Amino acid sequence: MKVISIASRKGGVGKTTTAVNLASALSGKVLLVEMDPQGNASISLGTNPDLMKNTIFTMLIGESTFDNTVIRTEYCDFIPANDDLSDLDMILILNKDKINPVTMLHDTLVSHLSEYDYIIIDCPPSKGLLTINALVASTDVIIPLQCEFLAASGVNKIIEAIYKTKELYNPTLSIMGIVPTIYDTRTSLSGLVLQEARRYFLQQNIKVFDTTIYKCVRFAEAPMSGKPAIDVYHDHETVKLYYKLAKEIEEYE
């Protein structure tokens, strides 16, 4: 099985959209874990995170269990998050002698790994403690790359964090690849950015997925339905692209 973090230093790059739709598109049993206090993945799966009593935060601090926190849907199982997760740093400061601050998520999930074929972690747009926990718990990382000017500089920041986490805490951590997102077919800039990204990351021995996710207004509207976009707009071209990306992931060695 694989534990895959969807990680980016920058918001608005399709990170949560990618996490939610991959969780639905992948074959087998999938768990989506939200580690972003904004709660957008939870909203996309039909819940109001602000009304959730049990979340990833309560699991991490031992106030709830996996079984009474996980929410089971027809698309995937998921563990929600809300703004309470922003308080985790303070909890750790107050309990630094009792809790390992970088292995909390791994320690919480480890006994449930065998229940799933894939665990997808939606990271916050930062390289702080929440993202480090996600990387320590992961086998692989997928990095969304928005096809716009200077996008690669933000990707390099998260790559640095991944390599540092690999060095210090998780020696088997691997970058599965970079997925180009929000590709605007109406402009030449997206094509130029993608071409340069493929050349640049090839030199770093980092895979760029063959699948490119196009910019799609409908996908931005999908969270209002409480369903993954691929389960709302069944025949849309972008839906086919997410299934193609899922196939690439399933064939990854």
Model-assigned labels for residue ranges:
Residues 1-253:
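P-loop NTP-binding core
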